[in-house]
Amino acid sequence: MAEFIALIPAAGSGSRMGEDIPKQYRPLASKPMIYHALRTLCSAERIGMVCVVLAPDDTEWARHDWSEFAGKIRVFGCGGATRAESVTNGLKALRAENHVQDQDWILVHDAARPGLSRALVERLLDQLAQDEIGGLLAVPLADTLKRADDTGRVMCTEPRERLWQAQTPQMFRTKLLLEALEKAPTGITDDASAVEALGFSPKLVTGDAYNFKVTYPQDLKLAELILQERTATQN
């Protein structure tokens, strides 16, 4: 029976946040940002392991207490220069230690999406566990899209019908995901794009607006409010 394994690539620098520490360690609701994704993924009973891929020279991870996840996480210091490289290296490390089989499902999640909920994880597992290809969380695009010219003026308005904004986790079987990433064209920004490049069509599973990616400093306040509301509801 196929297992479910989550993988968080956490080797980025987060330069757009303007911080002197990597974004995934930026304090958020009194914890490092990555903590919130770890907590959600580790709480999902069907996920057997959560793999964290750090930069080889990471010095921040050891400064924090991760003991509450000790029975479920596996940490590798094999992150690469890009997200795709980090995921690829993490998969190879899992294989080398016999933690994963070709038909196991890998859920790749961004460390900078602290708003992921347990309900979204369960929805993803429910809808993709029997799928032939796999897929990803995503939300239908709500905003109007404008295409700009080189001077910053509007060239045209793009139709938004059938357009979705990709989120994570993105869930594919080990063998397919590794092959896709190894053959992926330069510049891909997510795992689904690599799978698409092989000619497959991943399934879109409806996510929600809370599962946004923290990219700029102004995103932090919204993420903080979401986490505070969730904590209050749970209590």
UniProtKB/Swiss-Prot annotation:
It catalyses: 2-C-methyl-D-erythritol 4-phosphate + CTP + H(+) = 4-CDP-2-C-methyl-D-erythritol + diphosphate. GO terms for molecular function: 2-C-methyl-D-erythritol 4-phosphate cytidylyltransferase activity. GO terms for biological process: isopentenyl diphosphate biosynthetic process, methylerythritol 4-phosphate pathway. Pathway: Isoprenoid biosynthesis; isopentenyl diphosphate biosynthesis via DXP pathway; isopentenyl diphosphate from 1-deoxy-D-xylulose 5-phosphate: step 2/6. The record marks R16, K23 as: Transition state stabilizer. Belongs to the IspD/TarI cytidylyltransferase family. IspD subfamily. This is 2-C-methyl-D-erythritol 4-phosphate cytidylyltransferase. The gene is ispD.
